[in-house]
């Protein structure tokens, strides 16, 4: 795989969403000063690009707090449109510009009051006391009831004992298997103990049953697989500011990935034929699609395999998190805005991507989905289900949500370094030992910058 493909595929990994319109600036500079408008103060928000949820929150907040000015600074490598927005996917250059610009501002003691934390080196910011601990703000605010929210998501989004990046929604990460194919091959899966090596052997057995033109996952490339491995094991690969890539753990990861492509379980080529997949990535994006997936009789939902067969809880991911600059002079105003974004009213917005953090909102959405399932109008499933079956599946979803305890979060710069060096191992140019040492040295250099 040449460098152009490496960069192109990395861009696929960092793509999260397009953007929508809002009152955005050019990203010309940061702000930690207390700005005074005609009637109040100004909150500055730094983001790579405006998300629909942030856009709607700003517009609605201005109606109830006209005394607060909110300025959004977008940082994109490509030119912006007249309205400061773009419908294009984020590129690697966009991510690099955002990380570099915001990090430079934060290191100098400046920067925006609120920062979109996704893709930023959060652990570095926390180590240098650049972010405010949300738990402190919650404890000081008698109007905020944290019990209305999923505590396990808060707790597993922490750095140490503090919460420095506020999640507003989350997605459950899992995979699905074809029920009929698995039954025909007489395969039973214990997803609490299975490993990627076990997954490979199961896939090979299924291929013998249905044909060699099948693959475990369609359109899953080696660097995507590597990025997923790193995310799932990030706390072991970066432990208390120390890199652990020159280790048997990481070398075994690389060997597992290479063996799956060498043995034909996966193919590093694009295909439009998704009927030739044995398994599917099954991210549960929201209550309605989640219920559809667990109700589908053709599919069986599984936890992802692990490197060592040790189940550590359901993995989840938050695609939109916010931090508050510890140097901000409008921290109270920033917290009030974020608290508004966590309100039941805002969390009920259709632009929320994922399961809302507000438990009451999720309960209502699950109840609505249940009624649709019983009536036979649930999207993707053109059949009716009895209320008892639907309720049992809703309880399965609750178990997944309540068991979510592994935050799939990583420093994209670390992932980028690993991807750049990994290709030389996949192509046979370098040994797994040499590549792990190269990655270790480069990551350590980056960490110590």
For each of these PLM feature ranges, what is it?
Residues 103-104, 111-113, 142-181, 302, ...:
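A structural signal for short loop-to-beta-strand junctions that line the ligand-binding cleft
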Residues 56, 225, 251-336:
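Extracytoplasmic/periplasmic substrate-binding proteins
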Residues 375-447:
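C-terminal capping/gating helix-and-loop segments adjacent to ligand/active sites or protein-protein/ligand interfaces
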Residues 15-18:
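C-terminal motif of bacterial Sec signal peptides marking the signal peptidase cleavage site
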Residues 36-50, 57, 68-75, 113-114, ...:
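Short, well-ordered beta-strand elements
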């Amino acid at each position: 795989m040449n460098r152009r493909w490496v960069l192109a595929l990395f861009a696929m990994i960092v793509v999260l969403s397009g953007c929508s319109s809002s009152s955005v600036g050019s990203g010309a500079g940061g702000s930690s000063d207390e700005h005074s408008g005609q009637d109040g103060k100004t909150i500055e928000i730094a983001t790579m690009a405006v998300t629909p949820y942030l856009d709607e929150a700003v517009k609605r907040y201005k109606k109830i707090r006209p005394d607060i000015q909110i300025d959004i600074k977008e940082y994109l490598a490509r030119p912006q449109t007249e309205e400061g927005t773009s419908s294009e996917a984020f590129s690697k250059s966009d991510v690099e510009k955002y990380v570099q610009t915001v990090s430079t501002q934060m290191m100098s003691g400046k920067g925006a009051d609120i920062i979109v934390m996704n893709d930023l080196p959060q652990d570095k910011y926390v180590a240098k006391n650049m972010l405010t601990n949300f738990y402190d703000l919650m404890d000081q605010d008698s109007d905020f009831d944290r019990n209305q929210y999923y505590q396990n998501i808060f707790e597993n989004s922490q750095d140490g004992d503090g919460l420095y990046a506020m999640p507003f929604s989350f997605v459950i990460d899992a995979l699905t298997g074809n029920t009929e194919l698995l039954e025909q091959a007489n395969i039973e899966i214990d997803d609490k103990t299975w490993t990627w090596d076990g997954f490979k052997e199961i896939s090979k057995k299924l291929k013998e049953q249905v044909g060699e033109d099948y693959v475990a996952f369609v359109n899953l490339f080696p660097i995507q697989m590597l990025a997923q491995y790193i995310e799932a094991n990030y706390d072991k690969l970066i432990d208390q500011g120390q890199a652990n890539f020159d280790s048997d753990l990481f070398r075994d990861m690389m060997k597992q990935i290479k063996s799956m492509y060498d043995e034909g379980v996966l193919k590093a080529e694009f295909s439009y034929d998704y009927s030739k997949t044995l398994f599917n990535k099954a991210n549960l994006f929201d209550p309605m699609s989640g219920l559809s997936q667990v109700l589908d009789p053709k599919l069986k939902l599984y936890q992802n395999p692990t490197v060592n067969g040790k189940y550590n809880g359901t993995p989840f991911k938050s695609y939109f998190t916010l931090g508050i600059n510890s140097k901000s002079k409008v921290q109270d105003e920033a917290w009030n805005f974020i608290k508004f974004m966590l309100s039941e009213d805002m969390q009920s917005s259709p632009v929320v991507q994922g399961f809302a953090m507000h438990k009451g909102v999720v309960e209502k959405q699950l109840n609505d989905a249940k009624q649709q399932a019983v009536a036979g109008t649930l999207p993707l499933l053109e059949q009716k289900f009895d209320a008892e079956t639907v309720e049992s599946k809703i309880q399965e979803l609750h178990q997944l949500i309540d068991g979510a305890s592994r935050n799939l979060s990583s420093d994209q710069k670390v992932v980028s370094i690993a991807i750049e060096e990994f290709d030389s191992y996949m192509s046979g140019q370098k040994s797994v030992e040499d590549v792990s040492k190269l990655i270790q040295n480069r990551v350590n250099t980056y960490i110590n910058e």
